[in-house]
Amino acid sequence: MTISLSCDMMKDITEERHRENTMVKKFTTTQTIFTGWGALQENSAALSGLGKKPLVVTSAGTWKRMGAQLAEQLSGCFSAYAVCDCINSEPTDVMIAEGLAAYQKNGCDCLIGIGGGSPLDAMKAIAVGTTSSAPLASYMGKEIGGALPSMAAIPTTAGTGSEVTKFTIITDTKTDVKMLLKGEVLLPQLAIVDASLSESTPQSVTAATGLDALTHAIEAYTSKQAQPLTDALAVSAVKRIFSYLPAAY
């Protein structure tokens, strides 16, 4: 089936995008981002600037697959660190409470999230918990402010892009509601995006997170908040996903 647009329709679309692009837009993201094959090994020293003792937030599966590799990098940056590997694919307030308890018990002063979007989201929520005893549900619909512990995000999948966003989603186990928490303080200070870390990712996860990334790219391009900067990133992402996801899968 072929879909054609009339000249008038194309003109309307162009004019609408022009109006949107003349509006004042804001672009915020993580302060420092290292990307590329082997980025973690080459730039792991940057982690030492986070603090003295981090809590590593991850999943049991991720830590089992690459814990030895990650431990080598962490030991080169810190004299001690703690690990919370209780996060699964749907982080809940109960998991966040467990992570917060580990943070406090071990005297941690910063956070490192390693894994897919779930551990990175959980890291952000734990950071919020370190500054207040208020339940996470009380932050829904509000802009979170204040100073949080330093955070570094090390994604192992292409899915959510949580390492560069000011959002996190945590499930409230009492109401079964997915809570959206937001605030620029939730942006990590550091992101290390190392493609080599995705080599051991299961095939099904590679496919699912790749399509998730494609969805986010399309959403960004069609958003009313789109701007030339985000358009360039979105188009580049779509092209790369179509080129490389089939090969990676």
Predicted regions and their residues:
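Short, positively charged and aromatic/hydrophobic N-terminal segments
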Residues: T2, M9-I13
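ATP/NTP phosphate-donor binding region
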Residues: C7, T22-C110
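Short Gly/Thr/Asp-enriched flexible loops that form oxyanion-binding sites at enzyme active sites
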Residues: L100, P119-S132, V164-T165
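FAD-binding core of FAD-dependent oxidoreductases
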Residues: I112-K124, T157-T160
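A glycine/threonine-rich phosphate-anchoring loop and its flanking beta-alpha core
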Residues: T131-P228
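Active-site segments that bind and position negatively charged phosphate/pyrophosphate groups
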Residues: K224-Y249
